[in-house]
Amino acid sequence: MSVSRFVVRHSLMSVWLVLLAACGSGSSAGGTGTPAPGGGTPPTTPEVPQPEPPAPTASIGSCEATGAARTAERLARMRPGTLGQFVVSFDGKAGVTPAQKALLQTLPVRGAYTLNRLPIAGIVATREAAQKLMATPGVRSLRFNDPVTLDDEAANVLTSVTRAQAQTALVNADGQPYTGKGISILVNDSGIDGTHRDLQFGGKLLQNALGHLNGLGDVVGINPNLPIENVPNTDVLGSHGSHVAGIAAGDGTASAGLFTGSAKGASLIGYGSGAALFVLDTLGGFDYAMQILDTHPEYNLRIVTNSFGNTGDVGTCFDPADPTNIATKALSDRGVIVVFSAGNSGSGPDTITGNFKKAPWVLAAANAEKSGLLAPSSSRGSLARGSYFTDVDGERLIVNDRPTVVTPGTNYISARAVAADPFTPLDTEADISSGAIPLELIPFYTQKTGTSMAAPHLAGLVALLLEANPALTWREIKPIFEKTATNMPGYEPWEVGAGMANVEAALAMALSLRRDYGVPNHTQRGFFASIALGESTVTPVSVAFAPAGAVEPVSFEVGADDSLVLAQWTQPEGNACTCAIVLTDPDGNRYGSSIALPVLGATVATSAPARAGIWQFSVSGIGSLSGVSLDPLGVTNGIAGPGTVDATLTVFKTGTTQGLADIRGRSDQTTIEFAVAKRLVDGLPAGFTPDALLTRRQLAEYLMAFGVRQTREPSQAKRYTDTTGFAAAVADAVTAPGQLLMDLSPEALPPLAPASNGKFNPAGTVSRQQAAFALVQAIGRQALTAQYEGMDLFAFDAEGNTVPVADAADVDPALRNHVQDAIALGILDVQLSQQGGATVARINPKGTVSRAAYAGLATRAYNSIPFPE
């Protein structure tokens, strides 16, 4: 062990001991209720007992599916007699019947593929035949066979797989950690390379089938779906499916266990359609899954993972008659869990790529970066319609228009298909330059990014739960993931669903070791204070993009009473501009969308918190591919064809507020409102009560917003004698080590410490130095604070010069590094004054924190988080 590492570890232990000592009473460490910096009135005594948060408000609306109407409109635009490719769904539960095949033969249908176990067929027919078929009794729906696109060791730590497999209470009957053993996952993708040692055909890979339905355009006559089985390598055109398979269940053989899937013990089944996918191809995968259930029950197929989407199907309502929904419902009815990627069309609302990803029985994964934050390209749900009812098979269900949870999907290291990846030269260059993969392993592994990678990780987590409790269905698994998920700082449910998946807690629920998870999660509780979005204005904008030369942005103004800015563009068919749209705020912060690809109806969007001033809307091309710059000299506007981007800008006003009447007119009103809007703080039943003292119970509650996992002891042992219910849940979470989303170290200290003698002291107050430590720790800066070891405390004057901290002696020595970091980041405010002709700073470290003051501290901590652009 090096000397420097010993110093850091010794310092961390000292921090823990001082926190224990500092929290032994109901007051702050040495604090006597001294006035807040600036000489204001001392805060009042806190209210006790602390109220439980309100129940979540149920706002269930309605949403009319438009799939049939959109199909009719597209048919009307076709020329008479023109052939098209369509997917027709019949009434019924089994495969296409002889009578239904006979119906197709009576129409001018040139050719068809019929599925074997689903009442669905792909047809090539004229416009007139399609229109007639839509109106025929017994036909549930007809849709175009549109193209779909693939939604391209930190990961297992982020979702607590590593912790779960080290938890002695979470083991199977043999005393081994859950790895998905005995569960099979079907990968419905481009294919799987079963010659890869992590995905060995005949071992890990039980069956590998090659689909052929992408040949619909050439088919003549009525033909059954006959995938070719026992193909060792079906991933011959893309490597996407092999990478996905490795994320779900790769066993790490080629890397001696370094790169494994989230369910490394699970088995795999492959269904490959090649790199070019259409709706019918993916339906063939679902049909094959139904076949496996009938012909190979010994495989125990329980999960189908899908990493594709339809960018022409964004912002739409869930459609029960959509053929994909018919297929996934049939699988769900037989106990199969269906997982989808949310899509890569973010960062604006209404960008989930397919109404079928919103099905009540489907789990949709958003994409997290390794920092624990949401990837900008990850598709988001709807602002306008959060939840609504739908009727399916005689049952009323609720649709949530948002991802289910978030799982890692950025720069994910997994299996590389041998000699199959068209981007191998670029991928290899990026893999070498990243340094994340040992050079000798680059022939076998590569990095890819997207919700394509997040979905199989979630599928693997599902396998862990099913091994633990095979009786679970989607009706139990989906709520378990939502109740146990980790809040993500500043994000709303329409963006991240319930937050980051937490499989350690999910396993405890699946095993019925704990049933009390959920209350700290923002989707499972209500709030006393809230700020709604108000009215919006929509403005069309147009930018002519050229690969080189000047591209003029559009300037527009945002007012002080605005709260959110959105931009959205739907790329017309034939537009060569493979571009991203970008919003730039008055401070120069950029908010970009993903790239619009040349497929039918590609839609991209981006959003940003409003800042008063002049904004710019601009367009850019592709800057890099697989991490390699395509324009290293910077002489272009990005790689893209010329084209006009006709987008819309939507600016929302700040709407009505609830529970904040007592902050009106205060100088810190805007700060408190920001903290409330981001769920960094909440009000109380009587109002926000800004001048009341912040309690330890309130601090524990509010720290959960910064990504503290709500993991608790599986044994249900009561940790503190003075907490129950909600207070116990948050106290358990914020005092447990290694539970920070933004610090993956298992040695990460908890933001708060217990009091003493098995007590949490929920009504105790909080000092400024304790709040500074908690916030710096929560945003994942423990390792960075070591840079201040042995230094005197300093602050900055108005010119940026360093000045000494006059009351540094009042800071607990073991907290100094965190306090210094809080000062340097601007989290902890300072008072500058003259002393002996020199400027000095004071921080009042032992002063108690009011609720209003904490809102300011939390807001500044939030603004210190390096959110990805």
PLM regions and their residue ranges:
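Primarily auto-inhibitory N-terminal propeptides
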Residues: P37-A121, R127-M134, R140-R143, V148
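N-terminal domain-start motif of subtilase-like serine proteases
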Residues: P56-L83, R110-Y113, V124-Q131, L150-V187, ...
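C-terminal subdomain of the subtilisin-like protease fold in secreted/lumenal serine endopeptidases
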Residues: S62-A65, E73-R77, L301-T305, I437-K448, ...
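Substrate-binding/access-modulating region of protease and related hydrolase catalytic domains
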Residues: G95-A99, D251-S255, S273-W361, S371, ...
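Autoinhibitory propeptides
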Residues: P98-G175, K181, Q200-F201, P360, ...
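Subtilisin-like serine protease catalytic core
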Residues: L170-D281, P297-R302, D333-G335, K357-V362, ...
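Extracellular S/T/G-rich loop segment that most often corresponds to the catalytic His/Ser-adjacent loop
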Residues: D189, L210-V219, K357-A459
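N-terminal propeptides
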Residues: P520, T648-E869
